[in-house]
């Protein structure tokens, strides 16, 4: 969820604030890509997310397609054939969400099980509302309730992230469905709550802390070299998506 007006206001503020560097923790909205490119010509900018081939801006890439593939491979290895995937709105301005879902679907398609994956995404207008701390939790909870009315034969339910997965788990608990005995639940992000001992949640770690450090390294190097442009990929730290 993001507020386009707020994003535009903050971007325009950069010309007056003139910070030493800017770290963008998500892909810029499509309508602001040109503006971000103009800012990057004057101020060091690093983006943490899916690198956009249309932008000549340094990025620490979060490969959401790979994350989706890793999630699917794990479930397939455990024998899960009929699964559901619950996500926030899969809109054009939130492409990283779609990439994660697409990666997941590709793995199931490889083994001829694409039609065994149920995708339930929240309605697009939800992204227009102001995000609350429990917004994603509610998506997981409410869409799981809907799912259980439609089918009861899935053996695993995936949440786009851990907060959605928590909502999934609560909806299953209310329906007297045991996790992971009856249905397995998987999230992504390895948040603090997902690591609690009594939380039967499988989650994917993709080292966000390291990516933030890498983005800082990019900014510092650009400042030190007077905002020179890298001619190729410069690896900073190495880590596995699993």
Model segments located where?
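Beta-alpha junction/loop-to-helix N-cap segments that form part of ligand/metal-binding clefts
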Residues: 27-30, 39
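Short glycine-/small-residue-rich Rossmann-like dinucleotide-binding loops
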Residues: 26-27, 162
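Short, ordered loop/turn segments at secondary-structure junctions
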Residues: 1-2, 27, 50-51
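Intrinsically disordered, low-complexity polar regions and short flexible loop motifs
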Residues: 22
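Bacterial carbohydrate/catabolite-sensing allosteric modules
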Residues: 5-18, 33, 40-47, 51-242
